[in-house]
Swiss-Prot record:
Lineage: Bacteria, Pseudomonadati, Pseudomonadota, Gammaproteobacteria, Thiotrichales
Stored HAMAP family: LolA
UniProt KW Flavoprotein keyword: no
Protein name: Outer-membrane lipoprotein carrier protein
Subunit: Monomer.
Designated gene of the protein: lolA
PANTHER family: OUTER-MEMBRANE LIPOPROTEIN CARRIER PROTEIN (PTHR35869:SF1)
Keywords: Chaperone, Periplasm, Protein transport, Signal, Transport
InterPro entries: LolA/LolB/LppX, OM_lipoprot_carrier_LolA-like, OM_lipoprot_carrier_LolA_Pbac
Main function: Participates in the translocation of lipoproteins from the inner membrane to the outer membrane. Only forms a complex with a lipoprotein if the residue after the N-terminal Cys is not an aspartate (The Asp acts as a targeting signal to indicate that the lipoprotein should stay in the inner membrane).
Signal peptide range: 1-19
UniProt GO BP: lipoprotein localization to outer membrane; lipoprotein transport
One CC-aspect GO term: outer membrane-bounded periplasmic space
Family: Belongs to the LolA family.
NCBIfam families: lolA (TIGR00547)
Amino acid sequence: MKKIIICFIFVFSINVSFADATSELIDKIKNIHSMTANFNQKLIDGQTNNNLNSKGNMSLKKPQYFKWITTSPNHQEIVYNGTKLWIYDGDLDQLIIKKVSNDIAQFPYLILLSKNTNNINKLFTVTAQDNNSYILKPKNDQMIDSIKIKFTPNNQLEYLEISTSLNQFTKIEFNNVKTDVDISNTSFDFKAPQNTDIIDETKSA
């Protein structure tokens, strides 16, 4: 009987720990009402041993606006306004317009938006670490192995790390971070340059 009680207490304490970590993470993300930053991104492909470094800038505004612009080595933009998702490749002069997507497997940084933040406890098991960081393990997603979110001591976003089932590892480091800045909603509407090849998937059946 004593063993059963001890096991119950152990399991209960683990569940409480996960719940506390999830609540802490949700509170930190919810406190980011708007944000701009520069980023440096490193992609390591374990299958090919190739590394790809890129950099750019991003902005977000709760509850639904997001912009991710890669400036080097190629020009790419991902813009999300809660209704449409624009994916622009400047080198290919191609724009893909998608229906609203909350696909965290494809776009892990969308976890910073309100709708996805509220669903963290449904999508992930969250573990807190000592250095103001959190490990998120998907409950169902087959593509992502884990996401690590690290905050600075004053709770600004410091970096994201994403490990996938394809043996790929991505680290996104943020700098020049500014939070609670005034950003116009219209800055999240994308207008394609002239002569862009546009693939509009929102018009498909």
